[in-house]
Regions:
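Catalytic-core regions built around general acid/base machinery
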Residues: 44
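Structural detector for internal amphipathic alpha-helices that build alpha-solenoid repeat scaffolds
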Residues: 14-36, 47-51, 55-70, 76-79, ...
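N-terminal "cap/leader" segments of large eukaryotic alpha-helical scaffolds
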Residues: 1-21
Length: 167
């Protein structure tokens, strides 16, 4: 059943009956009680992101990685951060994946991207409450782009703490 659901992802869009991918949803639920199921599902979802799948399928995969993803998923998600069409999908997952790898990917995007993509990455650091990003966010307060400065200030406020307040 799971193999069939992943096969259905290759042609998935939001008009596809959700029953076609129900086995993936079921595996995501089962993954909370079984580390082996979680790792297997995570690897399959990562592999799916590497395929030529629709934006809707990438959205679905990123939502599942937000539930079951760990450090192994970060490189695949980070590769989407520079895409206008997919950045927010990846950020949604990276905001929820615990660990420094996800935070580092977002911090890198916050300093290396520009425009809306950069602002989104900055905001995601605030959503995570990423105290390790305070130095990065503080440095962005000196940028010329007022929206970058505003986003960095808002994220620092979301993170809170003495170090953020002193920035």
């Amino acid at each position: 059943m799971l193999d069939q659901a992943f096969e259905a992802l290759k042609t998935f869009d939001f008009g596809t009956p959700l029953s076609d991918v129900q086995a993936i949803d079921d595996a995501a639920v089962a993954a909370h009680d079984d580390a082996e199921v979680r790792r297997d599902l995570e690897q399959r979802l990562i592999a799916a992101l590497g395929l030529d799948i629709s934006r809707d399928a990438k959205d679905y995969v990123c939502r599942k990685l937000a539930l079951v993803g760990a450090a192994a998923a970060v490189p695949a998600l980070a590769s989407l951060l520079s895409s206008e069409e997919n950045s927010h999908l990846a950020r949604h997952a990276l905001e929820r994946i615990p660990g420094p790898e996800a935070a580092d990917a977002l911090a890198s995007a916050a300093t290396n991207l520009s425009g809306k993509l950069q602002i989104g990455a900055i905001g995601s650091l605030g959503v995570r409450g990423e105290t390790n990003a305070v130095e990065t966010l503080t440095s962005l307060l000196k940028e010329r782009d007022a929206m970058v400065v505003r986003s960095a200030a808002l994220s620092l406020g979301s993170i809170g703490g003495n170090e953020s307040a002193q920035a």
